[in-house]
């Protein structure tokens, strides 16, 4: 499966006093990348919550900050599936400037029902993933 790539521009609001991207903002960047990846598959997360009572939640993030990004940098967030099971999906996400990896993270997502309890990943979501890569 090819990576989904989402462009991100670094704005002044993203930087700290030193003029580099504040560390927590990388998590915002990869969240945007994940949300756009899901949207690109035709999954409407608002409708999924409304109709099935299911939402995605981040269970775990393991992150490495490798090099700084700076004001006005044009970045790209790359999102790829690492593993998927009935109840969770693990994504490999990177933030790049040109071909240089600045930040990498492995993110574990789970599905929660309307009561906030873990549940199986929605079938429609699993079908969309299967359409992307028949080996999953």
Regions found by a protein language model. Give the residues of each.
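HotDog/MaoC-like acyl-thioester-processing domains
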Residues: 3-6, 39, 70-71, 82-136
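Generic structural detector for well-ordered beta-strands
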Residues: 7-11, 64, 108
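Short, basic/aromatic beta-hairpin or loop at an interaction surface
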Residues: 48-56
């Amino acid at each position: 499966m090819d990576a989904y790539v989402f462009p991100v521009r670094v704005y002044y609001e993203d930087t700290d006093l030193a003029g580099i991207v504040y560390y927590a903002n990388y998590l915002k960047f990869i969240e945007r990348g994940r949300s756009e990846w899901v949207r690109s598959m035709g999954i409407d997360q608002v409708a999924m919550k409304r109709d099935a009572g299911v939402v995605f939640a981040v269970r775990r993030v393991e992150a490495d900050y490798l090099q700084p990004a700076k004001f006005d940098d044009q970045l790209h967030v790359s999102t790829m599936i690492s593993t998927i099971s009935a109840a969770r999906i693990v994504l490999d996400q990177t933030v790049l400037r040109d071909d240089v990896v600045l930040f990498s993270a492995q993110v574990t997502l789970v599905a929660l029902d309307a009561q906030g309890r873990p549940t199986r990943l929605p079938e429609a979501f699993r079908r969309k993933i299967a359409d992307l890569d028949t080996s999953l």
